[in-house]
Curated annotation (Swiss-Prot):
Residues spanning the membrane: 39-59
Species for this entry: Homo sapiens
Name of the protein in its database record: Killer cell lectin-like receptor subfamily G member 1
Disulfide bridge map: C75-C86, C103-C184, C163-C176
Membrane topology field: Single-pass type II membrane protein
PROSITE patterns: C_TYPE_LECTIN_2
General function of this protein: Plays an inhibitory role on natural killer (NK) cells and T-cell functions upon binding to their non-MHC ligands. May mediate missing self recognition by binding to a highly conserved site on classical cadherins, enabling it to monitor expression of E-cadherin/CDH1, N-cadherin/CDH2 and R-cadherin/CDH4 on target cells.
Free-text note regarding domains: Contains 1 copy of a cytoplasmic motif that is referred to as the immunoreceptor tyrosine-based inhibitor motif (ITIM). This motif is involved in modulation of cellular responses. Upon phosphorylation of ITIM motif KLRG1 associates with the two phosphatases PTPN11 and INPP5D.
Annotated GO CC locations: intracellular membrane-bounded organelle; membrane; plasma membrane
C-alpha cells in the first residue's frame, strides 16, 4: 500500500458573500458604539442632570410657600421666605424701639400682619415667648403702615401697654420698654414697597 496524500481546496464564502446569501448581517453584542453615539449619550445625561437641578431649585424656592433655603436669592441669609415676603425672627431681645431700628437698618420693618392667614402661618413658627411686631396703640391700635387692626383682637390689661407683640396664642399688648424677641418683614427685592 502506498501512502498517498490527497489535497483538497475549500472555497469558503467571504463575509460580504455570506451577507448577500443570508440577508443583513447582525452586529454582535461585543461591537463598540461609535464615538458620536457616546457623545450623544453624554450630552443627554448632562442635560437630564441640569434639568433636575433646575427643577429642584424651582421647587425649593418657588414651589413651596415658605422656605429657609440659603439658595433662594430673594431673601437674605437667616430670613424665611413665605409668599412674597421675607421674615426675620430674632434670637436676641430688645425693647420695641430698638427692634424697630434693627428692622429699619435692614430695609425692613417690624412685622405688619395683613390678614388672619398670615397670622396663623406665623404663629406656627412662634413659641410661648412674645415677639415685637409693628403694632402700636396711638388712639386705637394701628400698624406701622397706618392701617388699623381690624381682623383680630389684642389682649391688654394696662394703659401703659401701648406696643403690640405676638406669640403662638395670639396678639398681646405690652409695655414698649420690655425686652422681647421681634419679627421683621420685608419684600424680597429692595426696589419694592415695604408695606
Amino acid at each position: 500500500m502506498t501512502d498517498s496524500v490527497i489535497y483538497s481546496m475549500l472555497e469558503l464564502p467571504t463575509a460580504t458573500q455570506a451577507q448577500n446569501d443570508y440577508g443583513p448581517q447582525q452586529k454582535s453584542s461585543s461591537s463598540r458604539p461609535s464615538c458620536s453615539c457616546l457623545v450623544a449619550i453624554a450630552l443627554g445625561l448632562l442635560t437630564a442632570v441640569l434639568l433636575s437641578v433646575l427643577l429642584y431649585q424651582w421647587i425649593l424656592c418657588q414651589g413651596s410657600n415658605y422656605s429657609t433655603c440659603a439658595s433662594c436669592p430673594s431673601c437674605p441669609d437667616r430670613w424665611m421666605k413665605y409668599g412674597n415676603h421675607c421674615y426675620y425672627f430674632s434670637v436676641e431681645e430688645k425693647d420695641w424701639n430698638s427692634s424697630l431700628e434693627f428692622c429699619l437698618a435692614r430695609d425692613s420693618h417690624l412685622l405688619v400682619i395683613t390678614d388672619n392667614q398670615e397670622m396663623s402661618l406665623l404663629q406656627v413658627f412662634l413659641s410661648e415667648a412674645f415677639c415685637w411686631i409693628g403694632l402700636r396703640n396711638n388712639s386705637g391700635w394701628r400698624w406701622e403702615d397706618g392701617s388699623p387692626l381690624n381682623f383680630s383682637r389684642i389682649s391688654s390689661n394696662s394703659f401703659v401697654q401701648t406696643c403690640g407683640a405676638i406669640n403662638k396664642n395670639g396678639l398681646q399688648a405690652s409695655s414698649c420698654e420690655v425686652p422681647l424677641h421681634w419679627v421683621c418683614k420685608k419684600c424680597p427685592f429692595a426696589d419694592q414697597a415695604l408695606f
